[in-house]
Amino acid sequence: HPSHPSSSYPRIIATLPHTAYVKIADGCNNCCSYCLIPALRGKYQSRDIDSIIKEVDSLVNVAGTREISLIAQDITLYGMDTHERFMLPELLKQLAAISDNIWIRLMYTHPAHVTDELIEIMAASSNICRYLDLPVQHINDSILQAMNRKGSFRQIKGLIGRIRQLIPDIALRTSLIVGFPGEGEDEFEMLLGFVEETGFEHLGVFPYSKEHGTPAFNFPNQVDEMVKEERHHLIMELQKKVSFKKKKKKIGKILDVLVEGYIEQGMVGRSQYEAPEIDGAIYLKGRYQKIGEIVPVEIIAATEYDLVGRIVS
C-alpha cells in the first residue's frame, strides 16, 4: 500500500444530487475477530484533509448538495495514521465553515474513538446533524473481548451518557450482532436490557455469520442458527416498541425536512435525525416543494419507524 491514498477518490455516487456520501479514509485497523476488511483492504489510510474540503466545497457550491454523509470503516480514526491524533474534529470545523445551509452527517463511528472534543464540536455546530451512527455490536464484556472490540460495557454506557448530556436531542443509531460464539442466555439478556434501557432512535441487528479467514470462524461455542434467528426477532420486536415511543414524542414539534421525492399522497423527506436509505422517512402534506429544498414541517402523526408532517407555510 502507498503511504498516502490517492487524494482523488472516485466519489460514491449518491442516489439523488441533494445528498452525497464522502469517503474520508480507506482500510481499517480495528481487526474485529468476525471481519475480513483489514485483510482485504489493508491498513487505515486517511485522505488528505484538503482534498476532502475541496470535494465537499464542490459538491455544495457547484452541485447544490444539501447533505454530506461522511463515511469510512471508522470515521473517528481519521488522521491517526497521518497526524498521530484524532483529526475528525478539525475536519468537521473546516467542513462546517463551507456553508451554513448544509447538513453534515457522521456515519460509522467507533465507540472507543469518540472523543469529548468530537462531541463538543457536534454540540456547537448548527450544520452538523444531531445524529450519530455508533455501532456498538454488543454490550457484554466477554463478547466484546471475543469480538476483539475495543471498549467495554462501562465505557459505552458512559459515552452514551455524555453524548446525550451535551446533545439532548441527538438521534443515535447502532448496529448489533446476535448469536456470536459464546453468547449464552445471560449475555443475550444483558444485550436485550441494554437496548431497552438505552433507547436508540435507530437500530440494526444482524445474526452472526461465519466468515472464512476470520479468527471467529473457528471459535468454540458456536450458536445454533434457530437461536440466532429467535434472538434477532426478539431485538427487532423490542426496538419496534422503543422506536414508536421515540417517534410519538416528535408529534407537535416543528422540524426542518429535506424534501426527497414525490409520492401519490404528497411528498417524502427526512430531518437531520434520519440518515439516507437506512432510517425512517417523513411523509409530507402541503404545497409541493422542489426536491432538495429544506422546509419547516409540523409533525402530526407517527408510526413505528416513520413520521407524518404538514408543511408549515
What is the role of each PLM region?
Residues 30, 42, 76, 141-142, ...:
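Glycine-centered loop/turn positions within well-structured domains
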Residues 60-186, 196:
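Conserved SAM/AdoMet-binding glycine-rich loop
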Residues 72, 108, 136-138, 174-178, ...:
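Active-site proximal loops enriched in glycine and acidic residues that flank catalytic Cys/His/Asp
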Residues 218-313:
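Terminal RNA-binding accessory module
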Residues 32, 52, 70, 106, ...:
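Conserved, mostly hydrophobic/aromatic
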Residues 1-78, 117, 132, 153-161, ...:
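Proteins enriched for Cys/Gly/acidic motifs involved in redox and nucleic-acid/cofactor modification
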Residues 79-96, 100, 146-147, 210-241:
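Radical SAM enzyme [4Fe-4S]-AdoMet core and its adjacent flexible, acidic
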